[in-house]
């Protein structure tokens, strides 16, 4: 009898390149943050679903019933929250640990690397530098004009799981590494720009 396989395909973010001025000062950069994703098909019972929904709704101030509904989806990949900082990451790690210890529940919540765009010089040269949207795509200025150069290539993790949702042996996982974006060096000088 053939094993009924399901593929989980997870996207891994690529780090966007940094924009520098003529003297090497950072004008735009990406800092590490995390994305919280859930694999609802891996829940084995309602107790696990309720514990996960309670924990996630408390950490992120989300509606419990909305999160509980998400835990019932027949999906390997549901985004719970994007771009969380390290304090929230610690709470998620504690929740993952609690689910494993108290509910024998693992493989349902994951933290994936993500990036958040920062502009250390604030509005300085913002008309030139531009900005990115929530999907990290350049929308104005240098961020837009050099988007394909700055953005890099996202990676993927493809995992085969049997019909019961348990991971198959390691050989069924395929990783495609993400490639970080390129840096851009501008000819403008931030000290001169700030005096204009």
Predicted regions and their residues:
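Helix-start/capping segments and mature chain N-termini
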Residues: 1-55, 62, 166-172, 183-195
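Short, glycine-/polar-rich solvent-exposed loops and beta-turns at beta-strand/coil boundaries
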Residues: 12, 30, 67-73
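Small/polar-residue-rich segments within soluble enzyme cores
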Residues: 51-58, 70-181
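ATP-binding catalytic core of ATPases
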Residues: 59-67
């Amino acid at each position: 009898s053939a094993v009924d396989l399901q593929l989980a395909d997870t996207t891994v973010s690529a780090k966007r390149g940094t924009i520098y001025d003529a003297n090497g000062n950072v004008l735009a950069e990406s800092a590490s943050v995390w994305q919280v994703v859930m694999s609802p098909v891996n829940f084995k019972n309602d107790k696990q679903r309720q514990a996960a929904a309670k924990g996630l709704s408390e950490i992120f101030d989300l509606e419990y019933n909305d999160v509980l509904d998400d835990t019932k989806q027949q999906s390997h990949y549901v985004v719970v929250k994007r771009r969380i900082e390290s304090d929230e990451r610690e709470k998620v790690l504690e929740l993952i640990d609690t689910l494993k210890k108290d509910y024998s529940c693992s493989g349902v919540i994951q933290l994936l690397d993500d990036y958040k765009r920062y502009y250390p010089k604030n509005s300085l040269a913002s008309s030139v530098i531009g900005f990115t949207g929530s999907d990290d795509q350049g929308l104005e200025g240098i961020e837009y004009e050099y988007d394909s150069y700055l953005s890099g290539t996202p990676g993927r993790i493809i995992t085969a799981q049997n019909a019961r949702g348990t991971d198959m042996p390691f050989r069924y996982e395929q990783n495609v590494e993400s490639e970080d974006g390129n840096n851009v060096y501008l000819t403008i000088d931030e000290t001169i720009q700030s005096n204009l």
